[in-house]
Amino acid sequence: MSIIEHLEQLLEYGLERKLISIWDREYTRNRLYEALGIIHPEPVSSTSIKQSQSLPDLLAPIYKWAAETGRMEADTDTYRDLLSAKLMGCFVPAPSEVIRKFEETKALYGPKQATKEFYQYSEDVYYIRTDRIAKNVHWTVPTEYGELEMTINLSKPEKDPKAIAAAREQEQTNYPMCLLCKENVGFEGSVNHPARQNHRIIPVILEDEQWLFLQFSPYVYYPEHCIVLKGEHEPMEISKKTFERLLSFLGQYPHYFIGSNADLPIVGGSILSHDHFQGGAHDFPMARAEAEDVYELNDYPGVSLGLVKWPMSVLRLQGDEPGHVAEAADHIFRTWQTYSDEKASIAAYTGDTPHNTVTPIARRRGDLYELDIVLRNNRTNEEHPLGIFHPHQEVHHIKKENIGLIEVMGLAILPGRLQKEMKETAAALCSADPKTALEQNPLTAKHSEWANRMMEKRTITKENADLVIKEELGHVFARILEHAGVFKQTAEGKQAFRRFIDQLARKPVKSLNR
């Protein structure tokens, strides 16, 4: 097939997915020609073109042609992503039209249908890259904290050497200032910054402030994984306003959860420079975890406080008035900010440097507003230079990155290297001399101590090796979350947690479960 025929197939795809109407066909065709620098197209009958392929399959021969004819620097992931956004941007209307359609659907059919359709639209225009996401490995593992969710992240492509070299030569720019800024809408992109011609955002008002209900994450980790960001490029900051905004969002989108990463290094997310939340239509393991005790907060009638059975230190607020819940959350946050407990290795400050903050997550529970406050501390010491309440050295062979919002809630995002390393570990465990095989293979040597302990407590065969390793990875993740918990899952740790709760109520609290 010629390039013109491939583009006609792409047009048919756009018509089938209702990205364009028949009256947009010629206009969109000319935009595609312009995007590819086609000046004298050969005539082709659109009526003879039929297509039943997936979008990635439709784009593949276009990439090949573009690389062969010099329209694309190289046929690699980096340059394919730049070209695909440019081509699919030809099918995307102006932002105001996307917003109008969203608001119309929301008014007629409700917010759940509006977000569902916007999610499908984001897939159809290849903003959400479903083919890449499908590469991720998912499984669940039962633990004492409930069933934890596990993911080996294989969806994000690595930059190829050619793109890395080109990035070094390219002039650095501060536009857009970060990957979240609203200026990304329609942005052409470069080897240093992803293209966003097929990207649209939906505005949302939170507590009388203009925020933006961003598109769904291009590499979603769970259903309808969305980002809600501040209109201006301002750093992450947890305050009473944070809790009010989260609860305000739930008033408009009650079918979603919404949460914020912490605002300090080590315990925060990967982007601290732009205030934002993450949400979606997923019931995380932490949301399913029950409160072991429920208390009355003396100064906040109508708001209950529960200690969640979870490896991290989580306080769960519930109430039917969002304003009261936000007040109680702010009380917890302000108390925690200045709280120190030497017995529990908790210090609020080193000099003037603050260490205590929170990761808040909100959801609706019927008519109730539920707000989980996860206590965080980013202090380091000689024994734990990356963080006292951070994955410890013993688990770094699996994961040493920060524990952000998604993992706090019980979904592990493990590095892609583990896919091959765990396959090699399974083979070594089933070999004639497992210990030697583990130590001599550079892919498994770092896992040898862990794998040897696995052999001591589990019977491992060729048939069950993969399953055993996945189960043990789940238990490592539970331990990682325990490391990140400020009050430990010991008698001393639980006693320390209750000392903090006594501070909240100004006098010993009353447990409603006793």
Which residues does each PLM region occupy?
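Catalytic or ion-translocation cores adjacent to nucleophile or general acid/base/metal-coordination motifs
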Residues: K241, L250-S273, G279-S340
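Active-site microenvironments that recognize anionic phosphate/pyrophosphate groups
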Residues: M1-V228, E232-P235, K309-P311, A326-A329, ...
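Helical scaffold of the NTase/Pol beta-like nucleotidyltransferase catalytic core
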Residues: R200-I201, G231-I258
